[in-house]
Amino acid sequence: MKWIEVNTYDEMSEVAANIFLKQIQKKPNSVLGLATGGSPVGMYKELVARYQAGQLTFKDVQTFNLDEYVGLKRSSPASYWTFMHNNLFNGVNIKQENIHLPNGEAEDLAAECKAYDARIDAAGGIDLQLLGIGVNGHIGFNEPGTPFDSMTNIVELTESTRTENAIYFDDAADVPIHAITMGIQSIMKAKEIVLIAFGEKKMEAIQKLKSGHITEDFPASQLLKHPNVTIIYGGTN
C-alpha cells in the first residue's frame, strides 16, 4: 500500500488525476471504476481540463460506478447518474454505451446485482478503481459489518451515511434508505485501487486504516490485502 500525504484538496485532486491520466494514456480502452461524493469532484474537474487540453481521450474508455440509490430516478438531481454527467461525462468524449451505473430502478434488484458484476467481468475487469472513504470506514455503500466476500448487493444505509449524504438533497428525509453497491469483493477484484480522502472528518478513518487492523467492522481495512493500492490523503491541520 502506497501512502501519499498532500497539503490541499486541489493537490489531492491533481495527484489522483495524474494516476488516471497515465492509466488512460497507457491503455486507451481502460475500464475505470468511479466514485461519487465530494472527494472526487476536483479530480473529475482536472480530468475534464486535461481532456480539453488534448492530453487524453475517453473515446474507448468504459466506466463502472460503485453505487446508486434504490428507487431514485436517474433524472433526479441527487442521483449518481446525474452527478457523474454533471461532473465528468458531459465534459469529455465518453460514449454513452460505455457508461455503467447500477440500476436502482430495476424491477428485480437481485438480478441487477448479478448482472452488474457480469458486465464488469465481460469488460475484462476494472483496471483502476477510485474510492472515497466514509467516516465509518465504508467504501462504496459497504457499511460496517459487510462481509468481505460480498459482491454487488442491496444495502440499507446507516444513519451516519444518510446524514453525510443529506447535503445533496432538499430534505434529509429524502435520502433513500437503500442503495445498490459493488461489494467489497467486487472492489477487490480491480487491478489497481486509488483511495482519496481530505479533511479533518476523514482523517480518523485514515488513521484507523493506517493502524493495519483488518476487520469487517471497518470495511476499508480489507484494502490492506490488495497488492496495488494508493492512498492520497490530507487535511489533518
Swiss-Prot record:
InterPro entries: Glc/Gal-6P_isomerase, Glucosamine6P_isomerase, Glucosamine6P_isomerase_CS, NagB/RpiA_transferase-like. It is an enzyme of class 3 (hydrolase). Keywords: Carbohydrate metabolism, Hydrolase. Pathway: Amino-sugar metabolism; N-acetylneuraminate degradation; D-fructose 6-phosphate from N-acetylneuraminate: step 5/5. It catalyses: alpha-D-glucosamine 6-phosphate + H2O = beta-D-fructose 6-phosphate + NH4(+). The keyword Flavoprotein does not apply. Coiled coil: none annotated. It comes from the Bacteria. One of its GO terms (cellular component) is cytoplasm. GO terms for biological process: carbohydrate metabolic process; glucosamine catabolic process; N-acetylglucosamine catabolic process; N-acetylneuraminate catabolic process. Belongs to the glucosamine/galactosamine-6-phosphate isomerase family. NagB subfamily. This is Glucosamine-6-phosphate deaminase. It comes from Lysinibacillus sphaericus (strain C3-41). The lineage of its organism: Bacteria, Bacillati, Bacillota, Bacilli, Bacillales.
